[in-house]
Regions:
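Charge-rich, low-complexity intrinsically disordered segments
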Residues: 218-223
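Assembly/oligomerization interface modules of large self-assembling protein complexes
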Residues: 24-108, 128, 164-168
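Sequence/fold signature of self-assembling virion shell proteins
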Residues: 3-48, 164-217, 242-356
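Long, contiguous amphipathic alpha-helices that act as assembly "spine/axial" helices in icosahedral shell
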Residues: 77-182, 225-243, 327-343
Length: 356
């Protein structure tokens, strides 16, 4: 049987003697759970829990005075929606034979316990890498989830060959933002470059002089005054857009847009007093899963809102569940399992301005 784990690490004397001696590939550094939580509002909820928002009283005051006025009933704006948590699971199994023939074989137990990887360096590395993959799953579901997910071939946006069950756990924040902008066009600032038919055309269009700064200026002008007056509001943007913005400002004004790295990976800057955060995780997900092979689906995206308005809910204290790890003696198989629930909501749908 050929190795399926560490398959490129042949067990030769000149190779490493331990999995721990391998060098970790350079991490992106911006896709941790800590960074995810900086710009969303995480809630512990149950399916069916309400989100009730109380608005203002209808406008009042009509002409007239004197005795016997006409009395009418009034109305106070209000909305009610409910959480609808979807289930996610991660279920993995491995047999020790997956590492036979590689130098990871040196980490196996001897004798009867050879099949148990749980307390070996192999199991430690496996659990660590799997846990990080689960965090990336949270990013993917919370922002790109779609209960009606479809492949490009079925009039959807998912790349050919993608397993749609990796997305249909819940409707993510982008799905909710797209739906809201479809119902209220004033909340959308259009980006023409997204509609181009090839990667090169998309990039060329966004890099044209004045385009990126024009989009951002329009986004800020189009936004509800309750967003622009909110000191907590931030513009979240794909790396593709922020790179174009940096280029445009450099060309137009001959200055470099200053970026500050925070939270060990998030880059932020300010434009006309408004904070902008570069969310490169979005770009990677779009390139991996919303790619037709000739063009990307909305590679340039901006979301302008108070993070309090971007809600992510789970029924547990945190978004991540503890990874359950065990060795099944009868099957001589190692198992890793985690499960949880997830949903998203926009607290106030009218307090998001988007560009795409």
């Amino acid at each position: 049987m050929s190795a399926t784990l560490f398959e490129k690490w042949a067990k030769n004397p000149e190779n490493l003697a331990s999995v721990r001696d391998a060098i970790d590939a350079t991490a992106f550094g911006d896709d941790s759970l800590e960074k995810f939580s900086q710009f969303v509002n995480i809630q512990r909820v149950k399916s069916g829990d309400p989100i009730a928002v109380l608005g203002g009283y209808d406008d009042v005051g009509k002409s007239g005075a004197g005795c016997n006025p006409t009395f009418t009933t009034g109305h106070i704006a209000n909305t009610l929606k409910r959480w609808d948590l979807g289930d996610w699971q991660v279920a993995k199994k491995e047999c020790y034979s997956a590492v036979l023939g590689t130098f990871a074989e040196f980490a196996l137990h001897a004798g009867t316990q050879v099949g148990d990887l749980t307390d070996t360096e192999i199991g430690t590395v496996y659990a660590d890498k799997l846990s990080k993959a689960i965090v990336r799953m949270i990013w993917r579901l919370a922002w790109f989830g779609d209960k009606a997910a479809k492949l490009v071939s079925n009039s959807g946006v998912l790349t050919a060959g993608t397993d749609k069950t990796m997305f249909d756990v819940c409707d993510g924040l982008f799905k909710r933002i797209f739906t809201q902008c479809a119902s209220n066009a004033s909340q959308l600032t259009a980006i023409a470059a997204n509609g181009k038919s090839t990667y090169a055309e998309q990039k060329s269009a966004i890099l044209a002089e004045g385009v990126a700064t024009g989009i951002l200026e329009s986004l800020l002008m189009d936004a509800d005054s309750r967003i622009t007056s909110n000191s907590n509001a931030v513009v979240l943007a794909t790396k593709g857009f922020t790179d174009a913005l940096h280029h445009d400002i450099k060309v137009k004004y001959h200055i470099n847009l200053p970026w500050t790295t925070i939270f060990e990976g998030f880059d932020v800057t300010e434009f006309d007093g408004v904070k902008i955060a570069r969310v490169a995780v979005w770009d990677r997900i779009i390139k991996a899963y919303e790619n037709t092979g000739t063009a990307l689906n909305k590679p340039y995206r901006l979301v302008y809102a108070d993070p309090r308005n971007l809600m992510v809910g789970s029924n547990a204290d945190g978004l991540l569940s503890e990874l359950d790890i065990w060795f099944e003696k009868k099957e001589r198989m190692n198992y890793w399992y985690a499960t949880g629930k997830l949903d998203t909501q926009l607290l106030e749908e009218d307090l998001v301005q988007a560009a795409y």
